[in-house]
């Protein structure tokens, strides 16, 4: 059911036809590296893997912790998004795909859906961020926005209800963050 089984079939097909694949290593800062002439940029460039498949970096070494009990496949694919922080000199950029801020109190174990607060705590302040999940209802909670304090927020809208008014209010209200 849903997107994940089809994606897994696609990934397996791709691997069987020569595509090199590897697991996203939560906490790593060495998985994505510069290929051409990296030495001059070694101290100024980093991509840190913050979260993926139900795990969030702890902020220490390459250690991560699981965000929810049970099978991560029980949640939709959005909850399994990968999140990164890119640093280049003083510029920092955050992208968390479709991660959630857990703004669904009526759902069972809603607290397990709040990846944003934990990711925000380890990410820290950024210059630019991409709004999680197109700025939908369950994203960009106040704790997350305060932790990142971005100067610019990019919203990748793909339908007429992206972003939603409540998320825009959180993003634009200086009293929220």
Short names for language-model regions:
Residues 1-2, 75-79, 104-177:
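Cap/insert and terminal regions of metallo-dependent hydrolase folds
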Residues 1-109, 113-114, 173-177:
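Flexible, acidic/histidine-containing loops and adjacent segments that form or flank the divalent-metal
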